[in-house]
Amino acid sequence: MIASSAKIHPSSAIENGAVIGENVKIGPFCHIGPNVVLADDVEILSHVAVIGHTSVGKGTKIFPGAVIGGDSQSVHHSALNTKLVIGENCTIREGVTMNTGTVEHGGATIVGNNNLFLAYSHVAHDCRLGNNIILSNNVMLAGHVTVEDRAILGGGSAVHQFTRIGRQAFIGGLSAVSYDVIPYGMLNGNPGVLSGLNVVGMTRAGIDRPAIHRVRRCYKQIFEGDGSIRANAAAIRNEYLDCAPAIEILDFIAAESDRALSSPNRGAKG
C-alpha cells in the first residue's frame, strides 16, 4: 500500500506488499522490499536498500548507500520471523548497515528514537538501542549489544557481542569495548579502560553539581574498594538511595550480564 502523498522516483523499485506512509519521499535507484513499512514523513535518498521485515519510524531520514534490514551476519541465521524495528526521527547516514535479529534470541533488532548513525556504522543482529544515541563514523556493534539512552560512541570504536553500554556513557574513538560500560562512564583505548565519568554529559542532562560530586565518590568506592566491583557496589547501595544517578550505576552493576565490567585498570573485573 502506497499513500497518495508519497513521492517516489520512477527508477526506484517498490515491491508489492510494502507499506509506504504519507509524505514519504524515496529518491532514485532505491529498493524497498515486500515486508517493509515506512511510516509517515520518512525520507530516503538515492541508492538505499530497505529489505527484510523492517519498519522505519516517522520522520527518519536515510542517506545514500545504506542497507537497512539485511540478513543477520550469523552462521545460525534464519530469515523466518526475524525483523528490524527503527524508531522515529533517526538520521542514518551514508553506508550504514543494520541487520535483522536471529530466531534463537527473540528475532528482533530494536533501534529507538532520535538516534544519529554516522557514515558506515554497523548495527548487528539482536542489538537493542535506546534513544538519542550517537554512533560516529565506522562504529561497529556486534550482535546482542545493548546501548542505553544518550550514549555516544566515537569513530571507529568496536563493541564485543553481548556487551552493555550504559546511559550517557562516552566511548572514545578507536576504542575496543569488550566489557560492560557503566552509565555515565568514559572508556578509551584498546583494550578499553574506564577513564572516569562523563561529567560534561551529566551536566548537560541537568544533573546538579552536588549530585555529580556524590557520583564521583560512588565511582571511587566501587573501583578502588578492596572487594570485587559487584561486592563493592552492593555494600554501598544504601548510602546513595537519594542519589538517582548513583543508584542507576549501582543497579547496572548488579544486573545479570553475559560480560564482565569495564574498570579503570587493564582488563575487566566482576
Swiss-Prot record:
Catalytic activity: a (3R)-hydroxyacyl-[ACP] + UDP-N-acetyl-alpha-D-glucosamine = a UDP-3-O-[(3R)-3-hydroxyacyl]-N-acetyl-alpha-D-glucosamine + holo-[ACP]
Keyword Lipid biosynthesis: yes
Subcellular location: Cytoplasm
HAMAP family reported in the protein's UniProt record: LpxA
Pfam family for this entry, one: Hexapep
Enzyme Commission code(s) on record: 2.3.1.129
Lineage, highest ranks first: Bacteria, Pseudomonadati, Pseudomonadota, Alphaproteobacteria, Hyphomicrobiales
Function of the molecule: Involved in the biosynthesis of lipid A, a phosphorylated glycolipid that anchors the lipopolysaccharide to the outer membrane of the cell.
Family: Belongs to the transferase hexapeptide repeat family. LpxA subfamily.
One example of a Gene Ontology biological process annotation: lipid A biosynthetic process
Highest taxon of the lineage: Bacteria
Enzyme category, top tier: transferase
Chief location of this protein within or outside the cell: cytoplasm
Molecular-function annotations in GO: acyl-[acyl-carrier-protein]-UDP-N-acetylglucosamine O-acyltransferase activity
Subunit-level organization: Homotrimer.
Name of this chain's protein: Acyl-[acyl-carrier-protein]--UDP-N-acetylglucosamine O-acyltransferase
Keywords (A to Z) from UniProt: Acyltransferase, Cytoplasm, Lipid A biosynthesis, Lipid biosynthesis, Lipid metabolism, Repeat, Transferase
Listed pathway(s): Glycolipid biosynthesis; lipid IV(A) biosynthesis; lipid IV(A) from (3R)-3-hydroxytetradecanoyl-[acyl-carrier-protein] and UDP-N-acetyl-alpha-D-glucosamine: step 1/6
NCBIfam families in UniProt: lipid_A_lpxA, PRK05289.1
